[in-house]
């Protein structure tokens, strides 16, 4: 349902004058299931896919669990970013990650419904909140995927 709604909204935006020109739309997916990413990507519209790049932020399950526990704040537990998921739910919902099945290389393109979508995988461990660490980490990954995207647009 959510991806279908996203497709509709993007189609509406694209149909307007100026649409998504010079704009970035970020869609975040969470891992989960033997075909979680593959299934989610396969539901995106061709209009989204032909404009898309993927930045996969790689974090081990154990690190995800550690961050889940660390961000929990009893006093503000109703907050969007302060909640916690029980370990059993984390394992059941997010314990499986199919990303490396569909994108085994560090960067490249994956074919989704006949569209080659550029991607790069960025390791996000160890965790950091330091801009001096995060800046170069993200810059390297985003430069790589931007280069792949530019090459795909030249074809």
Feature names for model-found ranges:
Residues 46, 62-155:
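Conserved GTP-binding G-domain of TRAFAC-class P-loop NTPases and closely related GTPase folds
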Residues 24, 52, 119:
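Hydrophobic anchor at the start of a short beta-strand
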Residues 27-30, 47-70:
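Conserved phosphate-donor/acceptor-positioning beta-strand/loop module used by diverse small-molecule
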Residues 38-42, 53-58, 79-85:
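Short, exposed beta-strand "edge-strand" segments with a Pro/Gly-rich flavor and a Y/T-containing core
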Residues 1-49:
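Glycine-rich phosphate-binding loop used to anchor ATP phosphates in small-molecule kinases
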């Amino acid at each position: 349902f959510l991806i279908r709604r996203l497709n509709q909204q993007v189609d509406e935006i694209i149909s307007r004058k100026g649409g998504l020109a010079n704009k970035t739309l970020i869609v975040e997916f969470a891992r989960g299931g033997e075909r979680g990413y593959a299934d989610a990507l396969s539901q995106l519209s061709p209009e989204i896919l032909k404009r898309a790049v993927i930045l996969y932020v790689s974090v081990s399950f154990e690190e995800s669990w550690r961050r889940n526990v660390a961000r929990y704040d009893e006093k503000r537990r109703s907050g969007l970013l302060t909640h916690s998921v029980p370990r059993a739910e984390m394992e059941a919902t997010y314990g499986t990650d199919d990303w490396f099945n569909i994108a085994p290389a560090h960067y490249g393109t994956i074919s989704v419904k006949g569209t080659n979508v550029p991607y790069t995988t960025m390791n996000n461990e160890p965790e950091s909140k330091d801009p001096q660490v995060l800046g170069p980490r993200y810059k390297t990954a985003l430069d790589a995927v931007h280069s792949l995207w530019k090459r795909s647009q030249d074809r």
